[in-house]
């Protein structure tokens, strides 16, 4: 299967670089997987697509202000993007500098604070901060906006590049489908008789890495930490017993649930995942999906194509471009029901 099959032309003007004034003000493109039918709606209309007895599964990861600016003690400027917090003081991070720091190099953080580079792990650097790292990041860190939002972060991003239900700090990118939900909408969802459950997947910077191979099967997926608790397993079981649907909010929730059900049965799981879902891969848990519009040739577009069918997905994206939908993290959303017989690009 070719990566190029997942290319589409996207005008620069359709890349959302700022959030809308209200979270639920986004548009919603509904795709019925079994028929391929499209409906152009507003995100607040999501309620019309939910049924009493459904279960919505959210990712409650919290984005940390993971980008730091500073310099080596010798004077060279650098930029640090924390990828994973290892403990109270140590992190794995990407470092952008004219010359990579060597073990023992002391880094002075802009705004106050310091770290020592301990060792290198392939593309990542292990750093030890002199003070607890999470409070330091909250104090002087910058929100790690994606590369396609080509502007400096501002105060509004601290609130808007974060879901209202974020709890567990550790992500360096937002689970963006969740950005559309405000407290009033969550209350309305529960009032309709829809249950909610929460998984955690700490989204890594690898989510923005381009696929650099020609054949999808040759791609090596990045690893991310996730946790699916017994409470989620029980909630899915109750939902199934009453005939409800499991509605995943975001591809990270999909990857969490399907990682915990790789053998076909959903079980509690805590650890790293490198699950890569593309056309031809089965879904064991998820029946419907809320998701944003993804980058051309990205692994997330491949996941959506596996869920809805390749022809249906690419047709929906073409319609979204033609109708001027806003794309990517701060953009509009889709509601998709699973295609029971999805076709790939080669079918």
Swiss-Prot record:
Top-rank lineage group of the source organism: Bacteria
Q: Name one GO cellular component term.
A: cytoplasm
Coiled-coil stretches noted in the UniProt entry, renumbered to this chain = none
Pathway given for this chain reads: tRNA modification; tRNA-queuosine biosynthesis
Its UniProt entry gives the catalysed reaction(s) as: 7-aminomethyl-7-carbaguanosine(34) in tRNA + S-adenosyl-L-methionine = epoxyqueuosine(34) in tRNA + adenine + L-methionine + 2 H(+)
Chief location: cytoplasm
The protein's UniProt keywords, in alphabetical order, are: Cytoplasm, Queuosine biosynthesis, S-adenosyl-L-methionine, Transferase
The entry's function note states: Transfers and isomerizes the ribose moiety from AdoMet to the 7-aminomethyl group of 7-deazaguanine (preQ1-tRNA) to give epoxyqueuosine (oQ-tRNA).
Spell out the protein name for this chain.
S-adenosylmethionine:tRNA ribosyltransferase-isomerase
Q: What is the lineage of its organism?
A: Bacteria, Pseudomonadati, Pseudomonadota, Gammaproteobacteria, Pseudomonadales
């Amino acid at each position: 299967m070719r990566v190029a099959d997942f290319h589409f032309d996207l005008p620069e003007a359709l890349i959302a670089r700022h959030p809308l004034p209200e979270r639920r003000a986004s548009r919603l493109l509904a795709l019925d997987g079994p028929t391929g039918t499209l409906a152009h709606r507003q995100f607040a209309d999501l309620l019309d697509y939910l049924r009493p007895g459904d279960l919505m599964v959210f990712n409650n990861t919290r984005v940390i202000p993971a980008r730091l600016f500073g310099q080596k003690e010798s004077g060279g400027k650098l930029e640090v993007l924390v990828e994973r917090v290892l403990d109270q003081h140590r992190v794995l991070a990407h470092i952008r500098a004219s010359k990579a720091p060597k073990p023992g190099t002391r880094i002075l953080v802009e705004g106050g604070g310091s770290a020592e580079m301990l060792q290198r792990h392939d593309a990542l650097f292990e750093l030890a901060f002199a003070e607890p790292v999470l409070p330091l990041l909250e104090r002087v860190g910058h929100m790690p906006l994606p590369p396609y939002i080509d502007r400096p972060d501002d105060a509004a991003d601290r609130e808007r590049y974060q879901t209202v239900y974020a709890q567990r700090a550790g992500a360096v990118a937002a689970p963006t489908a969740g950005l559309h939900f405000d407290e009033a909408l969550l209350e309305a969802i529960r009032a309709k008789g829809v249950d909610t459950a929460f998984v955690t997947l700490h989204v890594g910077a690898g989510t923005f890495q381009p696929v650099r191979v020609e054949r999808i099967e040759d791609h090596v997926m990045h690893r991310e930490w996730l946790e699916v608790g017994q409470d989620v397993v029980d909630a899915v079981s109750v939902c199934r017993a009453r005939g409800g649907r499991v509605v995943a909010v975001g591809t990270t929730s999909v990857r969490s649930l399907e990682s915990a059900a790789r053998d076909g049965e959903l079980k509690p799981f805590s650890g790293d995942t490198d699950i890569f879902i593309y056309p031809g891969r089965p879904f064991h848990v998820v029946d419907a999906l809320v998701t944003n519009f993804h980058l051309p040739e990205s692994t997330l577009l491949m996941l959506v194509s596996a869920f809805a069918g390749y022809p249906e997905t690419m047709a929906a994206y073409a319609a979204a471009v033609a109708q001027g939908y806003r794309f990517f993290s701060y953009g509009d959303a889709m509601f998709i029901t699973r295609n029971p017989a999805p076709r790939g690009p080669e079918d």
